[in-house]
């Protein structure tokens, strides 16, 4: 199967997300599948770059900065992250219709429009690896109150876009 993996980080980044996605991509490759990884990258100067690591194709798409900046600016940049990634993705040589499924890694809920676009264009199913349940963590941090926006985000952005939920830990039951 041709699988598209979308994440916020991938090696050489040294985050737990990067390591987990690399391990997942390598395991898929070992099992005979063909994984391709897409990540946003604020460091690149072109719309996109393509590389191969251990037999895995990696597309780095130009994006706004989303780390090591103030909270307000990060929120704005993450809101527009999917738009930047869709524009860059459309410039690549990647054939979205060649994939059998897309797997994406949270907590970046702002991948929702990107996943919706890919699913609509290619008619494939998506699977979310859920690290923490959004918008629950925004309640925990006091960034959001339970109200219409909370319920909209919880129902539409997450549960209507993904097909399967995999939890890393059970602190926030569904």
Locate the predicted segments by residue.
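N-terminal subdomain of nucleotide-sugar transferases
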Residues: 1-57, 62
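Membrane-proximal helix-turn-helix segments that form the acceptor-binding/catalytic region
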Residues: 113, 117-121, 148-167
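Acceptor-binding helix/loop patch of EC 2.4 sugar-transfer enzymes
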Residues: 8, 66-73, 97, 122-155
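A short, charged, and often flexible helix/loop element on the N-terminal side
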Residues: 57-87, 145-149
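Glycine-rich phosphate-binding loop signature in dinucleotide/nucleotide-binding domains
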Residues: 92-99
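A structural signal for isolated positions on well-ordered beta-strands in alpha/beta enzyme cores
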Residues: 4, 36-37, 127, 166-168
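An aromatic- and histidine-rich active-site surface loop
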Residues: 82-84, 99-124, 128-131, 136
């Amino acid at each position: 199967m041709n699988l598209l993996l979308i994440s916020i980080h991938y090696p050489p980044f040294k985050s737990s997300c990067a390591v987990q996605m690399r391990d997942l991509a390598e395991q898929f490759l070992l099992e005979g599948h063909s994984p391709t990884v897409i990540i946003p990258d604020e460091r690149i100067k072109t719309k996109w770059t393509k590389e191969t690591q251990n037999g895995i194709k990696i597309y780095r798409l130009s994006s706004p900065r989303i780390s090591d900046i103030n909270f307000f600016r990060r929120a704005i940049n993450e809101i527009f992250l999917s738009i930047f990634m869709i524009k860059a993705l459309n410039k690549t040589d990647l054939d979205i219709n060649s994939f059998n499924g897309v797997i994406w890694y949270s907590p970046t809920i702002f991948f929702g429009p990107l996943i919706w676009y890919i699913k609509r264009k290619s008619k494939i199913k998506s699977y979310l690896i859920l690290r923490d349940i959004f918008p629950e963590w925004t309640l925990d941090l006091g960034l959001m109150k339970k109200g219409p926006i909370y319920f909209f985000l919880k129902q539409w952005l997450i549960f209507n876009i993904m097909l399967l939920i995999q939890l890393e830990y059970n602190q926030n039951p569904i």
